[in-house]
From Swiss-Prot:
Residues 111-327 are annotated as: Domain III, AAA+ region. Residues 75-110 are annotated as: Domain II. It comes from the Bacteria. The lineage of its organism: Bacteria, Pseudomonadati, Elusimicrobiota, Elusimicrobia, Elusimicrobiales. Oligomerizes as a right-handed, spiral filament on DNA at oriC. This is Chromosomal replication initiator protein DnaA. Gene3D superfamilies: 1.10.1750.10, 1.10.8.60, 3.30.300.180, P-loop containing nucleotide triphosphate hydrolases. Residues 328-452 are annotated as: Domain IV, binds dsDNA. One of its GO terms (cellular component) is plasma membrane.
Length: 452
């Protein structure tokens, strides 16, 4: 193996990790790490002592696997912490302020990504309320009418960007504000780590002394009883101290399945949904990414991508990166025919997704299970009806661009019933290969019907 990780290999690994964890997570947790390889030992240098080794390890294990595949052979992981080699110099303090009460101010390690700002966020009809609410939080930090702020959406629509933008704007106005960004998964991991180290008080002191707590993907805390309880007490401590709390989720507070006391707290502030961006917003997002990245891509190609990819901003930007990388490697200028070829798998999948009609789903599933179509909307709850209904609702979440409430209305059920059906069928598919094959056959039949 090479003694160091060369730049090409590092870039390839980073791109691969972005497909696994997403661009935002890699920017926050992977890029700040320094990696070197010597004598089959991958040394991972954490940027400071506050960095969670538990969280970093999740990303590093994937990097390790990627390097082993790339170069062959097993490697070991060793962790280190970056030391500040700058010689210590006592700060010059006027004699009148020196003494026992003197405390030098040190910026709090916020974990924020400085690239995510309000200025870099494209506002549109789909996200306007969430964007304006985020700005209001900064102007009236900790005020009851804006606290907490909960932003929810499907993945890849900009929730994390807004979280970081809030923190970065606060720090711009007050560099010594105690801001902390973390995911729900990280909260759980650090809490467990504090229990294992028999030092939960340090964990509580850290999280309950903040000026602003920014938590991404709170749904990861749900279902973990002791972590939910710890977060509830942390929430109360911050809320009663008039400190700001901003949370994101992939579902509404009512759908989280958490302690009703906490759910009630989350609903007491502002709850805002980010929907899929419309065509104009998608074009604006791609133009901004093109201009900031200095990509040579014409507006006609930008419009083609924006029209063909509607699922998420993350996927939009990923398509732009894929196209420009392909064109750079082959020395060609991006055109619509080239974009159509390079992005055919994504755009064709998106087109198929948007073409599926919920009536086609009902028709095929009812025929497969030998029930009447009207049974999907009936009040009957016996297994012979409820099971096909759950399958049909699951397929509607997978094969259409309908929102959960829209699917609920299609089946005359509420969105929580749709969520339950989706999770139940997903679990069954994962655990039963025969059932998974059955679902795949139903999907093929639905697509065949929809083409007629």
């Amino acid at each position: 193996m090479n003694n160091i990780i060369n730049e090409d290999l590092k870039n390839r690994i980073l791109k691969e990790m972005e497909t696994v964890f997403g661009v935002e997570a890699c920017e926050t947790w992977l890029k700040p790490l320094s990696l070197s390889l010597k004598n089959d030992i991958l040394t991972v240098t954490l940027p400071n002592k506050f960095w969670s080794k538990t969280i970093a390890d999740k990303y590093v294990q994937e990097v390790k696997s990627s390097i082993e595949k790339e170069q062959g052979g097993d490697i070991q992981i060793k962790y280190d912490v970056l030391e500040d080699t700058t010689p210590y110099k006592r700060p010059e303090i006027p004699p009148q302020v020196m003494g026992a009460n003197y405390n030098a101010k040190i910026p709090f390690p916020s974990r924020l990504n400085p690239n995510y700002t309000f200025e870099g966020f494209i506002e549109g009809p789909s996200n306007r309320f969430a964007y304006r609410a985020a700005e209001a939080v900064v102007k009236k930090l900790g005020e009851r009418e804006n606290n907490p702020l909960v932003i929810y959406s499907t993945p890849g629509l900009g929730k994390t960007h807004l979280l970081h933008a809030i923190g970065n704007r606060i720090l711009k106005e007050n560099p010594y504000a105690k801001i902390l960004y973390m995911s729900g998964e990280e909260f759980v991991s650090e809490y467990i780590e504090s229990l294992q180290n028999r030092n939960p008080e340090a964990f509580r002191k850290k999280h309950r002394s903040l000026d602003c707590f920014l938590m991404d993907d709170i749904q990861f805390v749900a279902g973990k009883e002791s972590s939910v309880q710890e977060f509830f007490y942390t929430f109360n401590a911050l809320f009663e101290s008039k400190k700001q709390i901003v949370l994101t989720s992939d579902r509404t507070p009512q759908q989280l399945g958490i302690d009703p006391r906490l759910s009630s707290r989350l609903l007491s502030g502002i709850v805002s949904e980010i929907k899929r961006p419309d065509l104009e917003t998608r074009i604006a997002i791609l133009r901004q990414k093109r201009d900031t990245s200095n990509f040579d891509v014409g507006d006609d190609v930008i419009a083609f991508i924006a029209e063909g990819v509607q699922a998420s901003i993350r996927e939009l930007e990923g398509c732009l990166f894929r196209l420009t990388t392909y064109c750079n490697i082959h020395g060609v200028t991006p055109t619509i025919p080239i974009a159509r070829e390079v992005l055919s798998d994504i755009i064709s999948m998106e087109e198929k997704r948007l073409l599926i009609n919920p009536n086609s789903i009902k028709k095929v599933v009812s025929k497969h299970f030998k029930i009447d179509i009207i049974d999907f909307n009936s009040k009957r709850k016996n297994h012979s009806i409820a099971w096909p209904r759950q399958i049909a609702m699951y397929l509607a979440t997978e094969l259409t661009d309908m929102s959960l409430p829209e699917i609920g209305r299609e089946f005359e059920r509420d969105h929580s019933t749709v969520v339950h059906a989706r999770e139940k069928i997903k679990e069954e598919i994962e655990n039963d290969p025969f059932f998974a094959a059955q679902i795949n056959q139903i999907i093929s039949d639905i697509k065949a019907v929809d083409k007629r």
